[in-house]
Amino acid sequence: MSASLNRLERKLGHTFKNQDLMLLALTHRSFASRNNERLEFLGDAILNFVAGEALFERFPQAKEGQLSRLRARLVKGETLALLARGFDLGDHLRLGSGELKSGGFRRESILADALEALIGAIYLDAGLNTVRERVLGWLAGELDSLTLVDTNKDPKTRLQEFLQSRACELPRYEVVDIQGEPHCRTFFVECRVALLNDKTYGQGASRRIAEQVAAAAALVALGVENGND
């Protein structure tokens, strides 16, 4: 193995028994047909489990919706990309020439996906206890900074943070109708989310309120919240 990959292992805190798993986790789909997408899928599931378990133990009084919102903040793409940059992960990615020229090694989504793939690779290489220890070590600072106050954000913010944690495009809001006299109007807004087949809707005395209602409905439709939190 090259000296640069040995340095990466030291930064990750894990020495791979199966070096092929590490190389596969660093291989973007633009580089080869055998790439890190399956490992990313596995790593995403493991990350959500490990983060969820840690939050469950850390916040025994939190409701389901609060835990979901805390987890969305903890595992969002921005956080993962920041960790990846701390590991200099972009220097080790195997990218196709097009992605290299366009700066793919700096792109947040590619870095976050590669880190999730490495989580999947560490799980296959060493098991759940080891990957849990590594992930919790990486996220220790973020975990320590979380409080239940972080769950009091408005629905639009919570929806945006959830979608960012999944590297999805942001929701789009559109006023579809305004009814009533100028001094007593009711705004009707639709919210479009790429992960949902159907739009969600909200109404209120202002556009802002209607958008918040539509965002709350989207969170319920996505299964992130149950509407009673």
Swiss-Prot record:
Keywords: Cytoplasm, Endonuclease, Hydrolase, Magnesium, Metal-binding, mRNA processing, Nuclease, RNA-binding, rRNA processing, rRNA-binding, tRNA processing. Gene3D superfamilies: 3.30.160.20, Ribonuclease III domain. Belongs to the ribonuclease III family. The active site is at D44, E116. SMART domains: DSRM, RIBOc. HAMAP family: RNase_III. One of its GO terms (molecular function) is ribonuclease III activity. The gene is rnc. It comes from Azotobacter vinelandii (strain DJ / ATCC BAA-1303). The lineage of its organism: Bacteria, Pseudomonadati, Pseudomonadota, Gammaproteobacteria, Pseudomonadales. InterPro entries: dsRBD_dom, RNase_III, RNase_III_dom, RNase_III_sf. PROSITE patterns: DS_RBD, RNASE_3_1, RNASE_3_2. It is an enzyme of class 3 (hydrolase). The keyword DNA repair does not apply. The keyword Metal-binding applies. Residues 5-127 form the RNase III domain. Its EC number is 3.1.26.3. One of its GO terms (biological process) is tRNA processing. Mg(2+) binds at E40, D113, E116. Digests double-stranded RNA. Involved in the processing of primary rRNA transcript to yield the immediate precursors to the large and small rRNAs (23S and 16S). Processes some mRNAs, and tRNAs when they are encoded in the rRNA operon. Processes pre-crRNA and tracrRNA of type II CRISPR loci if present in the organism. It comes from the Bacteria. One of its GO terms (cellular component) is cytoplasm. Pfam families: dsrm (PF00035), Ribonucleas_3_3 (PF14622). Homodimer. This is Ribonuclease 3. It catalyses: Endonucleolytic cleavage to 5'-phosphomonoester. Residues 154-224 form the DRBM domain. It is found in: Cytoplasm.
